[in-house]
Curated annotation (Swiss-Prot):
It comes from Methanothermobacter thermautotrophicus (strain ATCC 29096 / DSM 1053 / JCM 10044 / NBRC 100330 / Delta H) (Methanobacterium thermoautotrophicum). Its EC number is 2.2.1.10. The active site is at D25 (proton acceptor), Y145 (proton donor), K176 (schiff-base intermediate with substrate). One of its GO terms (biological process) is aromatic amino acid family biosynthetic process. This is 2-amino-3,7-dideoxy-D-threo-hept-6-ulosonate synthase. Catalyzes a transaldol reaction between 6-deoxy-5-ketofructose 1-phosphate (DKFP) and L-aspartate semialdehyde (ASA) with an elimination of hydroxypyruvaldehyde phosphate to yield 2-amino-3,7-dideoxy-D-threo-hept-6-ulosonate (ADH). Plays a key role in an alternative pathway of the biosynthesis of 3-dehydroquinate (DHQ), which is involved in the canonical pathway for the biosynthesis of aromatic amino acids. It holds the Pfam family DeoC. 1-deoxy-D-threo-hexo-2,5-diulose 6-phosphate binds at D25, H26, G27, V28, S29, Y145, P146, R147, G201, G202, G229, R230. Keywords: Amino-acid biosynthesis, Aromatic amino acid biosynthesis, Schiff base, Transferase. InterPro entries: ADH_synthase, Aldolase_TIM, DeoC/FbaB/LacD_aldolase, DeoC/FbaB_aldolase, FbaB-like. Belongs to the DeoC/FbaB aldolase family. ADHS subfamily.
Length: 266
């Protein structure tokens, strides 16, 4: 499908088949936290650092997307819930593939909390959006997170494998999910999923070196890169953090080499 191939090349590096995506969609769920207040400034930093794409809600495109400088892919997030709602794990569709196309999006994303009480409704929406994406040639990223009463550990390799595979089975072109904690078990997740898998950053990680090690381990295991938000946009220097991560993902840098970029070296 030529439309999907063209658009995917705007968010995935064609030379490495990997990507560095920076999600900036957190404002709906947790409000205007540090790092996403000045959207244009943050996007400028992550673009200069080498991010392949940013991900945001429809209303923020006019506030932050590029009109200058280095080009960067645009992913529109179709799902939302607030932290104040009765069930924050229930993600609803708040816009459409057609609207994303009108905004100039290179891809769309849908969030599914696998194992939550409202999982069936979210799966229906994912499958429906996947079919519409096929009709329009629009790449679809499925954010597949294991969350629910039956799930004791959201990073358990077995539940992450199931979540990733479910997203691919329902038509996603790229899966975003949790890292399992070590390369061996994450390699099984990648093997079990026929489309590229990128890891989420999750809550703010304690040390930058720990984050970079996780990125390195995930690509070593066959991961297709990262979709990391808070650990990039709340870094002391989002540009340097993006550059360090991109160096690992695309250039094969070691963690030690990436730390030098993070600290402002070359």
């Amino acid at each position: 499908m030529i439309g999907k191939r063209i658009r995917i090349e705007r968010i995935i590096n064609r030379k490495t088949d990997r990507t560095v995506i920076v999600p900036l969609d957190h404002g709906v769920s947790i409000g205007p936290v540090r790092g996403i207040i000045d959207m244009a400034g943050t996007i400028d930093e992550v673009a200069s650092g080498g991010a392949n794409a940013v991900l945001m809600h429809k209303g923020m495109v006019r506030s932050g997307h590029r009109g200058y400088g280095r080009d960067i892919g645009l992913i529109i997030h179709l799902s939302a819930s607030t932290g104040l709602g009765p069930d924050p794990n229930h993600k609803v569709l708040v816009t459409s593939v057609e609207k994303a196309l009108k905004l100039g999006a290179d891809a769309v994303s849908v969030h599914v909390n696998v194992g939550s009480e409202r999982e069936p409704e979210m799966l229906i929406k994912l499958g429906t959006v996947a079919e519409i994406c096929d009709d329009w040639g629009m790449p679809l990223i499925a954010m597949m997170y294991p969350r629910g009463k039956k799930i004791d550990d959201e990073h358990d390799p077995e539940v992450v494998k199931l979540a990733a595979r479910a997203g691919a089975e329902l038509g996603a072109d790229i899966i975003k999910t949790n890292y399992t904690g070590d390369p061996d078990t994450f390699r099984d997740v990648v093997k079990g999923c026929p489309v590229p898998v990128v890891i989420a950053g999750g809550p703010k990680i304690e040390t930058e070196e720990e984050l970079l090690q996780m990125v390195s381990d995930s690509v070593e295991a066959g991961g297709a890169g990262v979709a990391i938000g808070r650990n990039i946009f709340q870094a002391d220097s989002p540009a340097n953090m993006t550059g360090a991560i991109a160096g690992i993902v695309h250039d094969g840098l070691s963690v030690e080499e990436a730390v030098r970029i993070l600290k402002g070296g070359e």
